[in-house]
């Protein structure tokens, strides 16, 4: 049994070992029609629920008689247990839990236990060493991120009842340095109005909403089949630890009954002395205005037909950046996350640069030409912290909706990429956003190795260069590639698994190829978006390959492939390359983030060696440094 299998087995068993056995008198299971009723006397803090990921969702309710009681969806174990999740039982002397869609002979009902504690000790081989992850459960979009009183608040889409998407809450973690995160209790929980989808948070410095100067106000989407997607508000007066939902929710409904209407981004627009909100409305972004964060008026729309097509817009952000560092020349940047729309399939982040006059946002470049914030396949739902002064700090979710639910992980699913600081530059008369790794990341460098300059027309192998680093390291260097050749590095282990990062001067591309990076077969289970399937069928009817396959390098499946970015975004003949490797990811930054590229990888043994290579001529590598990274 390899290390991955051992840890998976440990996790499956851990839920039973960590739970305190309950006597038959403590837990009684009965049936009333289609409902399983679990009556508990002397309840502990948690009922421990066994999960089997491939099964349909059961519906679980802590029944207190309150109108606020909310059903949660849990893939309860039928034949085997993949892992367990805790289900809070409240503070009463007894507890009643109701379950729908479960057979009386299901394994989960035979193995119900209770515990006053829940272990969050890591049991997953692929948990990153320096990227943010939830201790357990599912995480996707970062949302509601705000900086206040020395703390960065990271809220995120979170399912505490399984490692697949569902039961959307706002999870919560805080940090003083963007790297060391302390996990707190979920800040906003799914309720009877629906799932708590993405949104944003602001510091209400002038008490416009009436909850006190400095209250944190969250705007989010409540989503359900009954109510559709509606915008709601909650407020916090304890520095973002807990939120109270506004009694007048929802604060905004789509005026045309639109189904896909979500992810509100709120910002203060000083010239109008008012709050503005952008909501993703399927194929466009809609602007609204408010004086009190409660009553909103429609202003304008933006983006229909723009950028990569076909697509669906989600998770907007709207920030101001100085052009080439000149604070007297500011432009607005609209971040628009699209799913589908990625060059290589699935989800990605594009952006538009322009001007805003309090009513309309107008692009200054051709809006029909897509611009990508990151050219990897695992960079999505990128939004920025609010209230950070002159700094614009973005945080992407590090996955792709095509396969996010089937990655080879159990205890948790979902990690955030490294924080990036955004800047705006011009090249050839056009505006571009650079997304460079935030300087706070340098603080986790532990050891430094310096490698002598390399000049080669073949390869120089540095076997064991990152030995003992547990697959968590950074390598940076300057490279001058052969004029029409290829220069790069091969990051590998002794299992023959490797990720290639190289500059192809003939094609003028920066490339990351993970075709042979480790576990990749799960990519065959990838599920393209319906919009993507329709576009694929249209191309195939004309004898063309699907766009994502045509764009990718060495396509094997929707995970096993290479991604690329145009080197035309950079300047000069020498490039600065910075590569961050963690247990399940490789992130590339070229020339200060003019090119960023983020991809997941799942090597079965940590990468510990690096080969520098050149093809088609002699290339020069200099200023080579390798850093061990860790918390």
Predicted ranges, named:
Residues 65, 175, 236-237, 287-290:
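Conserved Ser/Thr-centered positions that define the repeating blades of beta-propeller domains
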Residues 1-26:
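Bacterial Sec-dependent N-terminal signal peptides
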Residues 49, 97-98, 141-161, 183-187, ...:
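Hydrophobic core segments of beta-strands in well-ordered, beta-rich domains
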Residues 26-50, 55-66, 89, 96-101, ...:
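Beta-rich accessory regions
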Residues 269, 278-387:
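A compositional/structural signature marking long, glycine- and acidic/polar-rich segments
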Residues 57-59, 63-65, 133, 149-150, ...:
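Beta-propeller domains
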Residues 59, 106-108, 167-169, 227-233, ...:
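Structural motif
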Residues 31, 68-87, 106-143, 162-165, ...:
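Surface loop/turn signatures of beta-propeller and other carbohydrate-active proteins
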């Amino acid at each position: 049994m390899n290390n991955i299998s051992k840890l998976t087995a440990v996790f499956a068993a851990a839920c039973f070992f960590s739970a305190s056995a309950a006597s038959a008198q403590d837990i009684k299971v009965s049936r009333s029609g289609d409902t399983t009723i679990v009556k508990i006397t002397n309840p502990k803090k948690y009922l421990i629920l066994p999960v089997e990921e491939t099964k349909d969702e059961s519906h679980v309710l802590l029944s207190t008689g309150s109108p606020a009681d909310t059903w949660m969806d849990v893939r309860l174990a039928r034949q085997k247990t993949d892992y367990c999740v805790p289900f809070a039982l409240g503070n009463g002397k007894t507890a009643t839990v109701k379950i729908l869609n479960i057979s009386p002979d299901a394994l989960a009902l035979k193995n119900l236990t209770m515990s006053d504690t829940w272990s969050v000790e890591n049991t997953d081989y692929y948990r990153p060493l320096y990227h943010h992850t939830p201790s357990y459960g599912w995480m996707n979009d970062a949302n509601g991120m705000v900086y206040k009183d020395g703390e960065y608040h990271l809220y995120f889409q979170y399912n505490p009842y399984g490692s697949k998407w569902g039961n959307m809450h706002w999870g919560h973690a805080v940090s003083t340095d963007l790297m060391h995160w302390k996990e707190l209790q979920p800040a906003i929980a799914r309720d009877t109005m629906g799932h708590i989808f993405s949104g944003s948070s602001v510091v209400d410095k002038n008490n416009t909403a009436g909850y006190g100067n400095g209250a944190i106000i969250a705007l989010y989407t409540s989503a359900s089949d009954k109510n559709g997607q509606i915008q709601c508000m909650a407020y916090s007066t304890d520095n973002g630890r807990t939120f109270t939902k506004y009694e007048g929710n929802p604060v905004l409904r789509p005026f045309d009954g639109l189904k896909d209407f979500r992810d509100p981004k709120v910002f203060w627009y000083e010239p109008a002395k008012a709050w503005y909100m952008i909501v993703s409305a399927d194929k466009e972004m809609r602007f609204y205005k408010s004086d009190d964060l409660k009553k909103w008026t429609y202003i304008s729309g933006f983006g229909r037909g723009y950028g990569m097509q076909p697509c669906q817009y989600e998770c907007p952000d709207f920030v101001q950046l100085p052009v080439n560092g000149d604070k007297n020349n500011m432009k607005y940047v609209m971040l628009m996350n699209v799913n589908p729309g990625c060059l290589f399939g699935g989800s990605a982040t594009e952006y538009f640069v322009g001007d805003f006059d309090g009513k309309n946002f107008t692009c200054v470049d051709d809006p029909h030409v897509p611009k990508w914030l990151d050219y990897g396949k695992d960079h999505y739902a990128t939004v920025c912290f609010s209230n950070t002064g002159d700094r614009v700090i973005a945080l992407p979710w590090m996955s792709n909706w095509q396969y996010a639910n089937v990655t080879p992980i159990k205890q948790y699913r979902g990690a955030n990429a490294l924080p990036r600081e955004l800047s705006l530059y011009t090249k050839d008369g056009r505006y571009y956003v650079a997304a460079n790794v935030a300087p706070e990341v340098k603080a986790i460098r532990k050891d430094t190795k310096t490698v002598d300059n390399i000049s080669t027309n073949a390869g120089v192998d540095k076997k064991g260069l990152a030995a003992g680093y547990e697959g968590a390291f950074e390598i940076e260097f300057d490279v001058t590639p052969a004029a029409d050749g290829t220069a790069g590095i091969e990051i590998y282990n002794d299992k023959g698994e490797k990720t290639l990062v190289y500059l192809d001067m003939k094609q003028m591309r920066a490339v990351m190829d993970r075709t042979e990076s480790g576990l990749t077969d799960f990519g065959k289970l990838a599920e393209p978006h319906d919009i993507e399937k329709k576009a694929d069928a249209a191309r195939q009817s004309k004898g063309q390959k699907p766009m994502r396959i045509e764009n990718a390098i060495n396509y094997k499946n929707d995970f096993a492939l290479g991604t690329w970015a145009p080197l035309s975004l950079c300047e000069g003949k020498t490039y600065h390359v910075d590569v961050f490797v963690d247990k399940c990811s490789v992130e590339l930054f070229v020339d200060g983030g003019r090119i960023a590229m983020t991809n997941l990888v799942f090597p079965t043994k940590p990468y510990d060696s690096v080969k520098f290579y050149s093809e088609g001529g002699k290339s020069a590598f200099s200023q080579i440094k390798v850093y061990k990274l860790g918390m």
